[in-house]
Amino acid sequence: AASPLYEQPLLVKEAQTVNAATFADGQQMGKTLTLPVHWNKATAKPLLGNKVNEAVLNNGVRGSLKQTDFEWCSWGSSDRISFTVDLLQKEKMNTLTIGCITNYGMGVHKPKSIRVAVSDDNATYRDINELEYTPEEIFREGTFIEDLSIDMRGTVARYVRVTTEGAGECPADHVRPGQESRVCFDELIIE
């Protein structure tokens, strides 16, 4: 291969597609990895609280249909989840989108509600908008990814807090009746 050998982290500062492969003795070993990196107002911004599992929420990489691909963030309990991103400066926001996977067989479903609040000082928050889902919308069969979008109404703020309420236990007619459903998010996108 005539490409340079990368021995340091590859810095990406805008949307682009990274293609990478492993070589030994000039021969490509395995397939080429194609990794689309998306960029938005939340990408690479600090997530407050330093929870290791939440680092994938704004790394610019979307998850696949396998919730085990290390791009999905999940929590030990999905009763109530809350995370805050610091945009580092006041930004105008029109839409907040969060990727959510449903894997019916594993009891992974979207939450009952998603609420977004904003702040200029990380002390006083004001609610902006909320999404709510019925059990019929939550406990759908199949494995699929949904982008759940919230109208931010042109709000200008520095801090954005997302709070979700879990869907609770899987219903009696579910393949996992009585098991607490889990939530998995892949990417927080603020436009």
Please annotate each region the language model reported.
Residues D127-I138:
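Solvent-exposed serine/threonine-rich low-complexity stretches and specific carbohydrate-binding patches
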Residues N50-E54, L131-E132, P177-Q179:
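Short intrinsically disordered coil segments
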Residues K66-N129, F144-E191:
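Aromatic, loop-rich ligand-recognition surfaces of beta-strand-rich domains
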Residues A1-S82:
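Short, compositionally stereotyped local motifs that mark structural "simplifiers"
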Residues V56-N59, T95, I138, I150:
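Compositionally biased, low-complexity repeat tracts
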Residues F139-T143:
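Short glycine-/Asp-/Thr-/Trp-enriched loop segments that recur within the blades
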